[in-house]
């Protein structure tokens, strides 16, 4: 369903997009909404690959989605918006994504305030 939605939004012209679709919230957007800025979704490798990633992979490879938005939460201890394995290794290298990646509102601020993975706000 996501692939068809993306194709409808972006159109079929190879020279330009009608609109830029954005697949979100990459990749393990789970857990209580009230603690989404500090939640750590702990998932097995198998669950990640079989449950959470297939829809995003289809959006990237079949739908040619132009943008991907990272989730607020952490996945296995690492904030999704700064997750090397998810954003670089899987999304870019394995799937060949060439579009742009965006963070959700305040997700970068959450590295320090919500997740506590930095010592200072600047870091």
Regions of interest found by a model, annotated:
Residues 1-123:
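Glycoside hydrolase catalytic-domain context in secreted enzymes
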